[in-house]
């Protein structure tokens, strides 16, 4: 069984790649250089892909800085920092990149059709904070319908399935799953700031660090 895995190099997507491997899939990884502030994550994506031994790893390049609209694609917009979970959950954060998962899933779908994969794995998660609209179960269900209606495979046979194993999991549960699968956390990257070391105060760092602390574990990146 072949599967395409959306791989950013972060904690969630790395766990999903390891889960796909554990599910017995032949893994094809796809990552994206969209000129994000935290381009450093692609180094981690390459390392994680190598540890699993994926069949192929494609890095697709396009520039979302041309219209900005997010703190991750516009350096003039400050990253939110040092917020607690309650603050993060109040509004869609400025780190939301408009339609990003729709763009990513479209590329993954095309790639899956080409390599004749039956699954696309994505590491979206809806529980830790209600920030991103394209990380919710109803969004994944809607995109599954796109996969069914918009592809040759969907019209002539069985549609490529979107697999989102982390969608209803807390960050602590994701770390526990990753530990059981042997994910090398030291090779992953979560920080939005884009430096050589994690900033420790952006939303992504805070969520990650808090989860490790709740489990009584040390984050090897901090």
Curated annotation (Swiss-Prot):
Its cofactor is Zn(2+). One of its GO terms (biological process) is queuosine biosynthetic process. Pathway: Purine metabolism; 7-cyano-7-deazaguanine biosynthesis. Keywords: ATP-binding, Ligase, Metal-binding, Nucleotide-binding, Queuosine biosynthesis, Zinc. This is 7-cyano-7-deazaguanine synthase. Belongs to the QueC family. Catalyzes the ATP-dependent conversion of 7-carboxy-7-deazaguanine (CDG) to 7-cyano-7-deazaguanine (preQ(0)). It catalyses: 7-carboxy-7-deazaguanine + NH4(+) + ATP = 7-cyano-7-deazaguanine + ADP + phosphate + H2O + H(+). Transmembrane segments: none annotated. Zn(2+) binds at residues 191, 199, 202, 205. InterPro entries: QueC (IPR018317), Rossmann-like_a/b/a_fold (IPR014729). One of its GO terms (molecular function) is ATP binding. ATP binds at residues 7-17. Binds 1 zinc ion per subunit. It comes from Trichodesmium erythraeum (strain IMS101). The gene is queC. Its EC number is 6.3.4.20.
């Amino acid at each position: 069984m072949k599967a395409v895995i959306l791989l950013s190099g972060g904690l969630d997507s790395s766990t999903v790649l390891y889960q796909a491997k554990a599910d017995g899939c032949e893994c094809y990884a796809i990552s994206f250089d969209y000129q994000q502030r935290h381009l450093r994550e692609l180094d981690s994506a390459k390392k994680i892909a190598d540890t699993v031994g994926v069949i192929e790893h494609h890095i697709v390049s396009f520039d979302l800085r041309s219209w900005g609209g997010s703190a991750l694609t516009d350096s003039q917009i400050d990253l939110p920092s040092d917020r607690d979970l309650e603050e993060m959950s109040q509004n869609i954060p400025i780190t939301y990149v408009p339609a990003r998962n729709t763009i990513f899933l479209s590329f993954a779908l095309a790639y899956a059709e080409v390599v004749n994969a039956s699954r696309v794995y994505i590491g979206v998660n809806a529980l830790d904070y209600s920030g991103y609209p394209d990380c919710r179960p109803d969004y994944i269900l809607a995109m599954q319908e796109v996969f069914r209606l918009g592809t040759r495979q969907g019209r002539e046979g069985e549609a490529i399935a979107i697999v989102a194993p982390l969608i209803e999991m807390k960050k602590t549960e994701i770390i526990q799953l990753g530990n059981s699968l042997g994910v090398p956390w030291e090779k992953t990257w979560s920080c939005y700031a884009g430096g050589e070391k994690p900033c420790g105060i952006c939303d992504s760092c805070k969520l990650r660090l808090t989860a490790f602390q709740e489990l009584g574990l040390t984050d090897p990146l901090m």
